[in-house]
């Protein structure tokens, strides 16, 4: 970093890590929301729920308010060896809406949700609103349990125009989200995520905005991002491109430390591989854990 000009290698690596953390962690929280809301809207509240209440959170439900309100408070527990979470999320659902119905929309308010990576203590803090639309109808719980006569596929769309992200260097930026998540079952839940926006001529865009260096970016999914319950709901494969930076950065997920596709590493990290062209025209590759 010379005379205030950010080294592109530094920006490529740091932005990739920021976007990966934001994307994987907000999707993980969306799984929490599914778990809680699916259970809340079931007739007895006691049906088997494969997506259990988060191990690092408490849940309160106000079914008498209008709209109905669910608060998830993350308590900083180390039950997940890879990260800790604090802060709260408030989910609202109109009293006239059943979440299982096609077209139902829940509104999610992130309130100082801080996610800290255990390996290096780096954190992001998220505030803002997003909506989750149940496009297909049905409940993720029934896909997980493979209950006969119910939807075998559930599709959700997540959108936001104002997710505020504070990075560990105290810089604050606003990002936008447009993701489509498809839930199927193959030895447990499989969650396949694709971007669904078109921004500046780029298709399949999942996130866009300004990175911590103050530069615009667009992140598109070039291969679907796949999360598997059989691997503890971790991102097991996928590829994105970051554009509008000094060079297009291609990031591939689900790899080992040598950059080769691998099976689930249990409590050890997966690795991602970044490929970009530096200012001197030389293609560079960086491999990092996630």
Please report, for each region that a protein language model flagged, where it lies by residue.
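Low-complexity, intrinsically disordered segments exposed to solvent
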Residues: 1-290
């Amino acid at each position: 970093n010379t005379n205030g000009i950010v080294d592109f290698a530094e920006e490529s690596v740091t932005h990739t890590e920021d976007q990966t953390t934001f994307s994987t962690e907000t999707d993980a929280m969306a799984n929490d929301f599914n778990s809680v809301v699916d259970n809340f809207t079931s007739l007895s509240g006691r049906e088997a729920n494969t997506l259990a209440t988060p191990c690092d959170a408490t849940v309160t439900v106000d079914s008498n308010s209008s709209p109905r309100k669910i608060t998830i408070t993350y308590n900083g527990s180390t039950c997940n060896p890879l990260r800790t979470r604090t802060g709260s999320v408030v989910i609202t659902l109109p009293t006239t809406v059943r979440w299982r119905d096609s077209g139902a929309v829940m509104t999610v308010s992130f309130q100082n949700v801080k996610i800290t990576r255990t390996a290096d203590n780096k954190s992001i803090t998220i505030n803002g609103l997003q909506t989750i639309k149940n496009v297909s109808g049905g409940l993720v719980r029934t896909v997980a349990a493979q209950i006969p006569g119910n939807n075998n596929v559930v599709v959700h769309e997540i959108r936001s125009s104002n997710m505020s992200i504070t990075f560990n260097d105290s810089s604050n930026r606003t990002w936008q989200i447009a993701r489509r998540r498809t839930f199927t079952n193959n030895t447990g839940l499989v969650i396949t995520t694709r971007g669904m926006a078109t921004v500046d001529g780029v298709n399949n865009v999942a996130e866009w905005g300004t990175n911590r260096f103050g530069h615009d970016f667009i992140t598109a999914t070039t291969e679907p991002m796949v999360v598997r319950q059989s691997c503890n709901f971790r991102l097991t494969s996928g590829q994105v491109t970051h554009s509008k930076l000094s060079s297009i950065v291609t990031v591939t997920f689900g790899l080992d430390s040598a950059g080769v596709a691998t099976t689930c590493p249990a409590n050890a990290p997966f690795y991602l591989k970044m490929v970009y062209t530096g200012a001197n025209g030389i293609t560079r590759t960086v491999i990092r854990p996630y």
